[in-house]
A protein has these predicted regions:
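Conserved active-site alpha-helix within GNAT-family acetyltransferase domains
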Residues: 123, 148-166
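Glycine-rich phosphate/pyrophosphate-binding loop shared by adenosine-nucleotide-utilizing enzymes
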Residues: 36, 88-92, 181
Length: 194
């Protein structure tokens, strides 16, 4: 399952504000699912995350890790978490937030170690993050945009309650930089979460 793009989240609510400033509490929030724990990315996680992102299967979706020497700390507009299973690094999930009150929503991207596929970690990761964004961060709508041929990810997102909105033609540059591929826009409203 290549997820680009249960349990309950932490037992407290976070206030959202119209700002890119993150509080210490937001940056240290640990989210617990039925199988996974999502914890803010630390320097200690980076070697494992870069190894996973560097696998052929994940790299085919996310691009070369060599193109991003400061990843995962290169985008201040996203909040990044490490996916842990029993303390072992299994993947990465990030979210971004549109703060304009007329369009407020969050977007999610993630990947998992190919060695951990088929055990429900993807579904638990997406569900855990969705609960956090809907309940703790105050969003009513989430979006995710897998490649149209990423059947495993699409199945995972649908299992959590995401619905297909439509195909975005020529949406994303191919990882080889030679062409473009279509993306599938999917969204989830708070009442859709399973």
């Amino acid at each position: 399952v290549f997820l680009r793009s249960g349990g309950t989240s932490a037992g407290f609510s976070l206030d959202w504000r119209h700002s890119d400033e993150r509080t210490e509490r937001e940056l240290t929030t640990e989210l617990r699912g039925e199988i996974v724990t999502l914890t803010p990315v630390t320097e200690a996680h980076v070697p494992d995350l870069r190894r996973i992102r560097g696998t052929a299967e994940v790299g085919a979706r996310w691009g070369s890790i060599d193109d991003s020497p400061t990843w995962p700390f290169d985008d201040p507009t996203t909040t990044c978490f490490t996916v842990l299973e029993g303390g072992v690094v299994r993947g990465f999930v990030q979210y971004g937030e549109e703060e304009d009150p007329m369009y407020r929503h969050a977007s999610v991207d993630l990947f998992l170690d190919p060695a951990a596929h088929g055990r429900g970690l993807g579904t638990d990761t997406v569900r855990t993050m969705a609960r956090h964004l809907l309940h703790d961060r105050g969003h009513h709508r989430l979006v995710i945009d897998p490649a149209v041929d990423n059947d495993a990810a699409i199945r995972c997102y649908k299992a959590v309650g995401f619905r297909e909105v439509g195909v975005m033609r020529g949406y994303e540059r191919d990882t080889d930089g030679e062409g473009w591929h279509d993306g599938l826009l999917m969204d989830l409203l708070a009442e859709d979460l399973t």
